[in-house]
Amino acid sequence: MVVSLLEKVRALNPIVANVANGVTIDQVANAQNAIGASPIMSNAPEEAEGIVTIAQAITINIGSLWAPQIQEMMALMTAAYQQQKPVVLDPVAVGSLAYRQQIIEQLLILDTPTLIRGNAGEIAYFAGIDWQANGIDAGHGNSDPVIIAKAAANCLHTIILLTGPTDIITDGQRVTLISNGTSLFQTHVGSGDMLSGLCGAFVAVHPADPYQAAIEAAATFAVAGELVATAMETPLPGTFYPQLIDYLFHITPAKVANTVQLSEVPTHE
């Protein structure tokens, strides 16, 4: 695997505008900053147009909804559409809660996100496939996650990054699998939010190919987490996060390329 976008993020220091989950806002900002991007966080709809103007990408996370934040999400989606800026959407718990589904449907009316990052329970919602989502967690179901991801991508005509023990990236036809990672991602609330933030940084510097941006963001994050867990004498969630930030700061394209376990699913005509 050729890893070219990590150094591009560090060289260009792209501004990524974030409507973040209030639970993990500092984690997302620190992850983006560590990887080389410049995060800006906002909850004020009045500044949405100005923020989109200066940003190279926008990430929207519905993890902790409140009225002014929802208004800004709508304003950001409108401005991003008008200014043709890439948008990463993290639809936290959309598979479990009807109100969140309403908000997502309103956002989709305004524009189609460039990339959607979620777990199986969240992505299954977009695919219209039955899945027993468990709040913010993936839950369980009988469908093949690859089928779920492809169906969602084809329904929305966008890039899907379905995260889990194996990360799945698809545009509805091509499918890339990344098998790195650590179980500590599941014990640290905010891991998915951080990855969505990194997707924003990578797509900011490579908006013409969000599929490749998603692959490289997912590979970088999964490899960093795996290396942290491997290096820890006693892998514990409380010490995992700060070391993950350190690894994101120091990780090199060569380390990602040499460590990533990546495979392509054959395309059947």
Map each language-model feature to its residues.
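Conserved post-catalytic alpha-helical subdomain immediately downstream of the catalytic base
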Residues: 189, 200-242
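Glycine/small-residue-rich loop that forms an oxyanion/phosphate-binding "nest" at active or ligand-binding sites
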Residues: 69-118
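Short pre-catalytic strand/loop immediately N-terminal to key active-site residues, enriched for Gly-Thr
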Residues: 179-189
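Conserved phosphate/ATP/ADP-binding segment of small-molecule kinases
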Residues: 100-175
